[in-house]
């Protein structure tokens, strides 16, 4: 322990003697450690951290593979009847439970509020072993027996605190959920947010209340509708693999049962074969399940790798500084060795300096990381739920930073410590620092470190170029919509107010008429499904006169739109007509008799070739059923999900023929600045019915930016990392060349005394810069080629081994190297030969 304190005192004295060195080293390390800490803060919360429940390692997620032969409402979804089969008959699980996330409108005395809701099975809390903070939570006996018979609500702890100010008398209070009276029965325990590490529901309701929560979409008994997500807790003795194996026989029994249903009995042999090839998947859910994780985890791992490269550049830079500093301290070290200090003791002192530098860098890096993490979070889109990801570092992040700091201190400190204590005592005590024998060895070490920095910087610059070009390509891919910066979109959910079917339609048409009559509005329309949100709903089609080939993709994306949709969106109608008042269906029979559709050009070309599709008929399903939908128009192609997904075949149907209309997405093309219209549009909806909330108001351009948030996150940080690495490499290169010029002052003076022109001296130094640059690039280019293949899935419109990106990275490094090398080269060429020959 005394030796430790001695090393610390020695290091602190050394730092005080050279504050500039200390500041530069700490800042370099802070940038590297801070970058890693910022990315790790999100990665840990989103990907690595276990759920805060008892024995999370025993939780699994269950879902069947495709094809479903029906409606699929999201990834890893299961039908509710299949969930019930698993819950009653699966032997590998203590309990099987399910949930589904959506949004509802809650009515209070002073207005309405749009909140996130999680529908859960009655055994949800029991299976997760989560209790109440106050009141009670759901139970199978009290909340999972009667269809539409459990109008109960459990508040999340966060929502209880933020909305009800932790009022304990809230239990027993009645609230309106989608205009339906329900009772608050409890508040879930603090610290429990749910199964999604990124978002938390505000309230939870029993899944038997689905007809209230999603009016018009009552499919609790529908096997062809996959919507809830199913989880389970393993029995002791079962693993994920053994549970998966034990569930396969039961799953195939369920498939045999489903195949007998009337809706599936007409399957062709091809589809029947695919149907029975389905498997049931069982995977660990110890960290929960998150769509946000699915979307951003790959990006975060890529960024973590790039942050690691930044840390290596920082370490190389600081190691180079330490080696240069060791040369100036060789006489001091030689004296200490001469009077009896052991080499191990001196190495311990020098390593302590490195560790203290890295710990100081980690402390500053933690401060920088919180600021950087907030910047990262600002790039993530709002989803309407309560965001759980935090920028503030917690104990896990703190431990990570300390571990990185210690590893970093040893990484960049060991080689300089070995180099500094390997001293020729006689030469060191006799000569001045500038003429020490160790200078040549030190220069070689520093040159190697600079070459490593060049190679690493090249990797980061190539990554920055690839990701920046990907974002540019995606943003400049034509959406098919005209002037999206002038197109305002917002969502209204009249169905949540439990309007009758005709009233929902008339409400939206009333709003549409008022919006169109507003000054500053050029055109307006609404649709059932939003565009450029990164998701959509596709369905198997049957087409008149087209015999599908085995394995042919017969899917098309569908949407229900109002009249005037094409004008509002700026999409051309290539043939036929728009929808109008004739295209409605107040009853299912009327809707089928008058069913019409407009298809996009891609659909028309695929199924009809050069023939006109106008007047032809299409239908839903695989092999049977009527072709009752008449095509009345063809629209130009436009994107549905987003640029990365490309153009799909699309079928548009009249919104007035939606079987169960609920929410609608409005699109308003404005002549004025869009932001000026926001309050006006909200007021218009409120004038029609103030109890119906408006949310998600933004321009379509902003929506596209949110859809590209993953690409923007990677590109932004890649550019920052690339620039940072280049600056650090430039500083390292400048330091090495300044060191070399100082060490070769006598040689340069002798050359000039013998008649060498200044240009020759200038070239002498710049040539060495080019050698360092060339060797670094020679190492970096093949590494960049290999590593870029691992991020190919994140690229768009640019090849992983894109030549022009590599050329641009080389040009940037060459320019930076020339500038960094020119200053010491110019100083060398300006040396006075007489002064140089006297230099020691």
Label each residue range with its predicted role.
Residues 18-46, 50, 314-315, 358-362, ...:
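Short, strongly hydrophobic transmembrane alpha-helices
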Residues 39-65, 90-92, 131, 197-199, ...:
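Membrane-proximal juxtamembrane linkers immediately C-terminal to transmembrane helices
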Residues 39-42, 319, 355-428, 466-470, ...:
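Small-residue-rich transmembrane alpha-helices
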Residues 1-24, 53, 69, 75, ...:
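Membrane-helix entry/capping segments
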Residues 31-60, 64-65, 372-382, 456-485, ...:
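Alpha-helical transmembrane segments
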